[in-house]
Amino acid sequence: MSAQMEEPETLGKRKESESSKLRSDETPTPEPRTKRRSLKRACVHEVAVPNDYTPTKEETIHGTLDNPVFNGDMAKTYPFKLDPFQSVSVACLERKESILVSAHTSAGKTAVAEYAIAMAFRDKQRVIYTSPLKALSNQKYRELQHEFKDVGLMTGDVTLSPNASCLVMTTEILRAMLYRGSEVLKEVAWVIFDEIHYMKDRERGVVWEESIIFLPPAIKMVFLSATMSNATEFAEWICYLHKQPCHVVYTDFRPTPLQHYAFPMGGGGLYLVVDDNEQFREDSFVKMQDTFPKPKSNDGKKSANGKSGGRGAKGGGGPGDSDVYKIVKMIMERKFEPVIIFSFSRRECEQHALSMSKLDFNTDEEKEVVEQVFNNAMQCLNEEDRSLPAIELMLPLLQRGIAVHHSGLLPVIKELVELLFQEGLVKALFATETFAMGLNMPAKTVVFTAVKKWDGDSHRYIGSGEYIQMSGRAGRRGKDERGICIIMIDEQMEMNTLRDMMLGKPAPLLSTFRLSYYTILNLLSRAEGQFTAEHVIRHSFHQFQHEKALPDIGNKVSKLEEEAAILNASGEAEVAEYHNLQFDIAKHEKKLMSEIIRPERVLCFLDTGRLVKIREGGTDWGWGVVVNVVKNSSVGTGSASSHGGGYIVDTLLHCSTGFSENGAKPKPCPPRAGEKGEMHVVPVQLPLISALSRLRISVPSDLRPVEARQSILLALQELSSRFPLGFPKLHPVKDMNIQDTEIVDLVSQIEEVEQKLLAHPMHKSEDDQQIKSFQRKAEVNYEIQQLKSKMRDSQLQKFRDELKNRSRVLKKLGHIDADGVVQVKGRAACLIDTGDELLVTELMFNGTFNDLDHHQVAALASCFIPVDKSNEQVNLRNELTKPLQQLQDSARKIAEIQHECKLEIDVEEYVESTIRPFLMDVIYSWSKGASFAEIIQMTDIFEGSIIRSARRLDEFLNQLRAAAEAVGESSLESKFAAASESLRRGIMFANSLYL
């Protein structure tokens, strides 16, 4: 295997070790540094200024609004010369004006934040530093405490020095302080929002937006962000909101230039695709593509050697791990360490790290230091927890300079890995993308083990912003002349896809603003009434972006109308009629299946070997084979159960080779075009069956061997060739003997429309262009309709309608009275933002919690906390079954009331998404005194995820205790306090190493 790779000139041409399987037979001569590095230290400064604003700063000291320069005494000096963007940022801060600093990871944004803190200290004022995650808050606290000493921390888990001049906190804590009218805010001059691009988070983005809206005008803001394409728009919103200037300082300069290499998995080495002048090398990309097998012209699904066109996640011949092994080994031999290897699956991280068992990167002296640091860190745990497998197995790995970092690790291990990495004692770190967030922990080299990731809906290519964020970890300022990025590619891909990924524009920051009951109730209960829900809606970034986009939408409509006029409309009526017949059949069949799929009708036909068609949302799995049917005990006896939600059908489905049943990938998905794929048993909810065939095939008794499962795939392919028009389906009346009048009528309607479709002249027409032209025209007309509707419907009016409907819900549930005055129930809900405030207050007031002991309370409350979904069946002990049923019934009631009040809500979806019973048994056992070693045997959820959920549960229970206290429920208050206390022990609540 040959590798083509430019080496940093400081290393010269090193002789390659004979033992390496990844040699460099051709090393280009590095260009002279002056020629090679042509990027300027570009710094763009813009400022949004309110109308009629008159600056009052003295120009000799502060420069002008358009050209800020500071000529006074610095609040803080640095041991290095500031970059242009840092100097301009300091000048803006000294003007006492808000600023957004948008720059790459490692560019030096922290220096700007530190200057704002130093200014506050100099001027005897207080400053708040917010971060999106508790773990990042802990890290930032340690860093700032080392620099400034007078620093406090408030995260919900921990409160340290709350009277300090600089307070580090999560954004949720800041929002709560703003709602409560905290006295602290009267002394605050600056609020620093770190990682402001988190504002686009679907769940939590609204917290940032509300906090920014509620901040008093006297407080100035510093926003730190990764590069984003609409920084100016964001600054204009801040200017509009607070009637004060907001500066934008943007740089895409990287202090350490990067070289980006592609590695075709199972193929021929490394190919430089983007050089350190950010030029995409097309010739190198083409050479890389040529290493992949070419598909035959007569068969798009097979390559010339009979294998699929891509190499799959596992590579062409050897396993994928061997490719990672070769790359890591080559990196170490060339002294390109430390290296961060990014994977998009936690289990994959661990598997890759374990595959390095033969490699050792640390000296004996370094091993001793690692062991000493490890033992010191473990002192925060009790004796019992120190012997956990997750801890004992980590030391040998760490001593060899290899580590894993992902959200499922024990927090103490995760923090230990971070500290060892910063000290240079971890040379190869296998991490998920969360490591690219937060503190600056750069490496010399970054490796991506895949070009695609699962985002909860589909496997998609990494976005440009994601690639920029992670690749930004490559190249250590002042240490490396160049950083190196290597991306592993497992199949042919479009040149533009890779170019856009590596060099594309970062995504814009888009508002995810939404109305919550928590917000409405808190605004209604504020005595001063300064902000109303209407005010918040009107001043949201969402509304600002909508109004700004209107002229562009108008131009788009004009262009689409021109396209619609040009499209060939000959025979349009005939094509439309044919299209409508197809649509009618699909609509009737969907309705028919929803009736057929009821357990009492369908279960007797779901015998082993039955062919069933599976559709999940927009994903069509095609035909699979039934293996087994099991009852889902976590679903109660409500309507979800009667519609089949209470049953799981284990089905053999054709899956992408990237998926494996041991959970190496987050979720199975169908194979890509041209991919061979493998058959796997996938648990499928009964309602996802979209068709039942009359055909059955023989299923081997043992499906563990790959060969046994692949024999089913061959059988399905053979049946497909025998039935080219599709597998014969079970007839609801003739085969299933369903005599229900509604179903008989539906079947007749479908057969009638099918006859019309078969008789239609378009059915046998070969004029594909006519159909395509019609479909495109229909798409264009639909898009025009949608855009016009968007222009017509004010976002403000939509939110007003939603506010009115949500207020009706609050009245029906007794949170507010007819005049909108907050009642006792509403006062309790005002204090709860960690779980569903409506549902949990319902349980508080309907007596559900009264009948439970504090262990059951802790277990039931855990259902409100987001947690990784377990792949195992939820089997609950008797003490928890009834409380869960009561919770599900209450959730269904609340969802139905919201539906009645015209809110767009799917009742069963609400119940399923709001209630997460996966840790009920675990929390119950822990609350009753079980050891951590015992409870981790009860679930397949990662240890770190269990601890994170338990800590969030403790925060939730404290909010419930405060809510009970606020409404005078002393017995409930005691119960919630006891539930919280029963959790707070051992490794679950061990102190952070940063504190």
From Swiss-Prot:
* UniProt keyword terms in alphabetical order: Acetylation, ATP-binding, Developmental protein, Flowering, Helicase, Hydrolase, mRNA processing, Nucleotide-binding, Nucleus, RNA-binding
| Database matches in Pfam families | DEAD (PF00270), DSHCT (PF08148), Helicase_C (PF00271), MTR4-like_stalk (PF21408), MTR4_beta-barrel (PF13234)
Keyword Lipoprotein part of the UniProt annotation? no
Where do the record's region annotations for Disordered lie?
Answer: 1-42, 290-318
Compositional bias (Basic and acidic residues): 10-26
Which leading EC class covers this enzyme?
hydrolase
State the similarity comment: Belongs to the DExH box helicase family. SKI2 subfamily.
Q: Can you name this protein?
A: DExH-box ATP-dependent RNA helicase DExH10
